[in-house]
């Protein structure tokens, strides 16, 4: 890493012993060792986070590609089931879409019951439409 040889390490140890003295040298060595281990752990943490982010980005790109390809690559059985789901969703929506004015006049005394089925129907049909797209 630093390309330091054995004799260079011995020279650094002798200089450190002379400068720091025998009382403070062990404490200084521990401090340097803690700093080096903290730096290594921080570098590994950053490396792991970058690898995780790259995996997430790759998965997002694959998802975008799959969405762009749409449902063209589906098997015929899946395409038939998607089409039947689309038709069922349209059939369910037709009666309610054609009669909101007649229901409003007949259920004007209880307005909460008139709006409740529409909310349920819309929320139930949205996932089918999203899947179909």
Curated annotation (Swiss-Prot):
GO terms for biological process: protein transport by the Tat complex. Residues 67-133 are annotated as: Disordered. Pfam families: TatA_B_E. InterPro entries: TatA/B/E, TatB. It is a single-pass membrane protein. It comes from the Bacteria. GO terms for molecular function: protein transmembrane transporter activity. NCBIfam families: tatB. Belongs to the TatB family. Part of the twin-arginine translocation (Tat) system that transports large folded proteins containing a characteristic twin-arginine motif in their signal peptide across membranes. Together with TatC, TatB is part of a receptor directly interacting with Tat signal peptides. TatB may form an oligomeric binding site that transiently accommodates folded Tat precursor proteins before their translocation. This is Sec-independent protein translocase protein TatB. It comes from Vibrio cholerae serotype O1 (strain ATCC 39315 / El Tor Inaba N16961). The lineage of its organism: Bacteria, Pseudomonadati, Pseudomonadota, Gammaproteobacteria, Vibrionales.
């Amino acid at each position: 890493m630093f390309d330091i040889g054995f004799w260079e390490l011995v020279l650094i140890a002798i200089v450190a012993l002379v400068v720091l003295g025998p009382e403070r040298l062990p404490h200084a060595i521990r401090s340097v060792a803690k700093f080096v281990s903290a730096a290594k752990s921080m570098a590994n943490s950053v490396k792991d986070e970058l690898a995780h982010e790259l995996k997430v980005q790759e998965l997002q790109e694959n998802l975008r590609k799959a969405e762009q390809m749409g449902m063209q690559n589906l098997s015929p059985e899946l395409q038939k089931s998607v089409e039947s789901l689309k038709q069922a969703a349209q059939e369910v929506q037709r009666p309610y879409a054609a009669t909101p004015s007649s229901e409003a006049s007949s259920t004007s005394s209880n307005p909460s019951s008139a709006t409740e089925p529409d909310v349920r129907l819309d929320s139930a049909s949205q996932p089918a439409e999203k899947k179909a797209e």
